[in-house]
Regions:
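Hydrophobic/aromatic-rich transmembrane helices and adjacent perimembrane loops
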Residues: 210, 342-378
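Membrane-interface transmembrane helices that cradle and orient dolichyl/undecaprenyl
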Residues: 131-133, 171-193, 223-227, 303, ...
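Transmembrane-helix motifs of polytopic, lipid-linked glycan transferases
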Residues: 112-134, 147, 172
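Hydrophobic, aromatic-rich transmembrane alpha-helices
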Residues: 18-28, 123, 295-327, 335-339, ...
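Perimembrane helix-loop-helix junctions
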Residues: 211-245, 314-320, 365
Length: 554
């Protein structure tokens, strides 16, 4: 299998050479548009390959969603077997697709799916810009996000994140909106699929809803204007039908599987608690701090700053001539997408850089609007980005002889098996469930075992909040339902967020602790993780393990 060391010099030089060709091709109009797009997507895939073959966790969310996918392949009923908290079911079902085709669910397969979403989003945005601003503007503007996404090595933009699918769906709705913006005859077929894609977004990630609403409102306005002109209401009706189709089918499935109460309690009410983060007045400062956490996104934003300012000036500048609908609707929609993207990135109050995925494409849309009459000058933006990445790589090469942040030699292109997972495999077999108390979801991925509780971490069962008892009750109910072969108490130095064994370990929660001690035997403690094995599994496998309170630690 393909591997990369820390300094694949020739590979990197080829990447920069291809990037230069892409930038030149963006202004060389004689090159066919399809050939230009092939070059751009080829560059993105080429430079993303080191991160894809690096088969290790880059972000805890990756392991969380991959664990969900492993579980859904075994028990495909979301909200019964899996609860992704703010992450919707579609994000997790997407990761099951490689398994259906015979591939392992791991970090490599997850990043391939993320890359496909990224490619799709780019193509949709290019098509929308081409429709709204013309091909010459679209080609020049398109190179900026391509260069950014191809050369960034910041983990939050290369790992599979819960924003990639909703952003893909969002850009699909933007492209469909562009198809009806200036049309004398609005296609009901297009409005149906626009509504369908928008209706799916709340079930990919709840934070994407504000941006979905912006596009739907724009489409509603166009359909209403069309109705006023023609008295034809089919596009409007089909938009509404499309928007209701996926939620209606989902609710039928929810009722068929008797999980409506779980949906209400844990997807609606549970996430309402999570949404109580930043207030409106705190959002600007929160967003500023978030952007500063990502040097690459900061440079991306600065490179687009002047075109964005031009776009704002053009939007609010008084016009002496009568504007077409597109002259009003397009910039208004894009500005609202920017504002809702900022809101979605900050409302939770958490400074997670991958939330900035909601802002990448609205940024470039407003920049493209700003330079549509002087598009060739915009070549400065991708050049600034390319020089930024080249400068960083040159400094890194000089200081550490390193170009690649995702070294995959020495077995790093294969799924790891940590000492904890090696120990638990003595007591498990394919098809078993396992449970991790605390937050260390990578153990599920390494063991390739389904999670025995709907949440694969216990953060919402541990921390104080109004629904803590409900989460604890479901946790215990899930343990009784799935009867996991092993339980890990991972609260400790290697756990995310929950590290205090004295107050957060499993023994601090009597109902759960009583069940564990009644049905499980403490086998060992490895890397500050306590391993419990189901008693009947010990007997079945004829393994003699005495209950111990203090055991070896590796």
């Amino acid at each position: 299998m393909l591997t990369f060391d820390n300094s694949p010099t020739v590979y990197w030089l080829l990447g920069y050479l291809l990037a230069g060709i892409v930038i030149l091709a963006s202004v060389y109009q004689k090159l066919p548009g399809k050939a230009f797009l092939v070059l751009c997507i080829g560059l993105l895939a080429f430079m993303r390959m080191p991160a894809i073959v690096f088969n290790r966790e880059l972000n805890a969310d990756e392991s969380q969603m991959l664990s969900h996918a492993i579980t859904l392949y075994q028990d495909p009923v979301y909200w019964r077997s899996v609860d992704g908290t703010t992450i919707g079911p579609l994000d997790n079902y997407l990761l099951v697709i490689p398994k259906i085709f015979g591939f392992q669910i791991d970090y490599t397969s997850g990043r391939v799916m993320g890359l496909l979403c990224c490619i799709g989003a780019l193509l949709f945005v290019f098509s929308a810009m081409k429709k709204w601003f013309g091909e010459s503007t679209a080609r020049v503007a398109f190179t900026a996000p391509v260069i950014f996404l191809a050369f960034t090595q910041e983990n939050d933009f290369v790992h599979y994140s819960s924003e990639q699918l909703p952003v893909f769906l969002l850009t699909a709705t933007i492209w469909l909106l562009s198809r009806i913006t200036d049309s004398k005859q609005i296609s009901s077929f297009i409005t149906f699929f626009l509504g369908l894609a928008a209706g799916m977004m709340p079930f990919a990630k709840l934070q994407s809803v504000p941006q979905a609403m912006v596009v739907v409102l724009a489409a509603l306005w166009l359909c209403y204007q069309f109705y006023n002109r023609t008295r034809e209401n089919k596009p409007l009706i089909f938009l509404l039908i499309g928007g209701l189709t996926f939620p209606a089918l989902l609710f039928l499935w929810i009722f068929a599987n008797n999980i409506f109460q779980d949906f209400v309690d844990f997807y609606i009410l549970g996430n309402a608690i999570y949404a109580g983060g930043s207030s409106f007045t705190e959002i600007p400062s929160q967003f500023y701090k978030l952007v500063l956490l990502s040097y690459d996104f900061s440079v991306y934003s600065l490179a687009l700053l002047i075109p964005i300012i031009f776009g704002l000036i053009q939007t609010f500048r008084p016009s002496t001539t009568t504007r077409k609908a597109a002259d009003f609707l397009v910039p208004t929609t894009v500005i609202l997408l920017i504002l809702t993207g900022i809101y979605s990135s900050t409302k939770s109050g958490n400074s997670f850089i991958h939330y900035l995925n909601f802002c990448i494409y609205p940024w470039i849309l407003l920049a493209a609007y700003g330079i549509k009459s002087r598009s060739k000058w915009f070549i400065a933006a991708p050049l600034i980005l390319l020089f930024w990445f080249a400068g960083n790589d040159a400094l890194s090469y000089r200081r550490e002889h390193r170009l690649n942040a995702f070294e995959s030699v020495n077995g790093l292109n294969k799924l790891d098996r940590s000492p904890v997972v090696v120990a638990l495999t003595e007591f498990t077999k394919p098809g078993d469930y396992m449970v991790v108390w605390g937050w260390q979801c990578k153990y599920y991925v390494e063991a390739q075992l389904a999670q025995g509780t709907a949440e694969n971490h216990s953060e919402r069962s541990i921390f104080k909040h109004p629904m803590q008892e409900k989460y604890l009750g479901r946790y215990l109910s899930d343990l009784k339902r799935t009867k996991p072969a092993v339980i890990l108490d991972a609260v400790g130095i290697y756990s995310l967020w929950v590290q205090d064994k004295k107050t957060q370990g499993i023994d601090n929660f009597p109902a759960v602790a009583d069940y564990v001690h009644q049905h499980y035997t403490l086998v060992s403690t490895i890397d500050d993780v306590t391993l419990y094995v189901r008693k009947d599994r010990l007997i079945t496998q004829q393994v003699t393990v005495l209950p111990i309170l203090a055991t070896t630690s590796h």
